[in-house]
């Protein structure tokens, strides 16, 4: 199976967690896009979705799925999203698609976080994939200096402005042995909006696409 076929398999597998009559939290990226396609087949059974990016909102609406503002939703049963890396503790690096802040906000509200990913995203130690950090533009250089002190090599993601109007620093060369401590340390830097480490709030269920089929891991 190709990588895209594995992504499609886990996207469709996540449908089993969607309860009729509910509002579904939806992530961003190539794997989440497959889940949105699958969700389209249930559009008449669900109330709608809360979206983590303008791109996902557009796709949801094109399939006839109602998109709610998170401020108008009291609770979310599930949030379904991909990951750039996921470790054995269900902690993740996310944000390759620059939607990390909205993703983290929606994940924090959802009762259950379902991570959908192909097997190439599984790692023992997080950090080989560059760690995205969303930053207020005026703080870019100041934040970069602090990230160097934490052992990383930050690189400005040229030409990318997030849906919130901010910039992204991708931090290379990190070996993140304590993801919770690293998430807290980076979030504490003035000017950081959020870091793409999902350690304090990791996934509850991981659906991993493998050549043998979809593997389910429950926290």
From Swiss-Prot:
Its EC number is 5.3.1.6. The active site is at residue 103. It catalyses: aldehydo-D-ribose 5-phosphate = D-ribulose 5-phosphate. It holds the Pfam family Rib_5-P_isom_A. Keywords: Isomerase. Disulfide bonds: none annotated. InterPro entries: NagB/RpiA_transferase-like, Ribose5P_isomerase_typA_subgr, Ribose5P_isomerase_type_A. It is an enzyme of class 5 (isomerase). Substrate binds at residues 28-31, 81-84, 94-97, 121. One of its GO terms (biological process) is D-ribose metabolic process. SUPFAM superfamilies: D-ribose-5-phosphate isomerase (RpiA), lid domain, NagB/RpiA/CoA transferase-like. Pathway: Carbohydrate degradation; pentose phosphate pathway; D-ribose 5-phosphate from D-ribulose 5-phosphate (non-oxidative stage): step 1/1. GO terms for molecular function: ribose-5-phosphate isomerase activity. One of its GO terms (cellular component) is cytosol. Homodimer. Catalyzes the reversible conversion of ribose-5-phosphate to ribulose 5-phosphate. Belongs to the ribose 5-phosphate isomerase family. This is Ribose-5-phosphate isomerase A. It comes from Escherichia fergusonii (strain ATCC 35469 / DSM 13698 / CCUG 18766 / IAM 14443 / JCM 21226 / LMG 7866 / NBRC 102419 / NCTC 12128 / CDC 0568-73). The gene is rpiA.
């Amino acid at each position: 199976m190709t990588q895209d076929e594995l992504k499609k398999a886990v996207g469709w597998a996540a449908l089993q967690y969607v309860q009729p009559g509910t509002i579904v939290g939806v992530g961003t990226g190539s794997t989440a896009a497959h889940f949105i396609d699958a969700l389209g087949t249930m559009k008449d059974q669900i109330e709608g979705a809360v979206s983590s990016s303008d791109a996902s909102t557009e796709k949801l609406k094109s399939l006839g799925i109602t998109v709610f503002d998170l401020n108008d939703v009291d609770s979310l049963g599930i949030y379904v999203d991909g990951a750039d890396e996921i470790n054995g503790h269900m902690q993740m690096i996310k944000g390759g698609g620059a939607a990390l802040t909205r993703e983290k906000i929606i994940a924090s509200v959802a009762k259950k976080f379902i991570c959908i990913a192909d097997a190439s995203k599984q790692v023992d130690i997080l950090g080989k994939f560059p760690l995205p950090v969303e930053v207020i533009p005026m703080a870019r250089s100041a934040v970069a200096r602090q990230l160097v002190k934490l052992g990383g090599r930050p690189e400005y993601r040229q030409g990318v402005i997030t849906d919130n109007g901010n910039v992204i620093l991708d931090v290379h060369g990190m070996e993140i042995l304590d993801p919770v401590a690293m998430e807290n340390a980076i979030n504490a830097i003035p000017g950081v909006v959020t870091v793409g480490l999902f350690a304090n709030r990791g996934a509850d269920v991981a659906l991993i696409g493998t050549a043998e089929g979809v593997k389910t891991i429950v926290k």
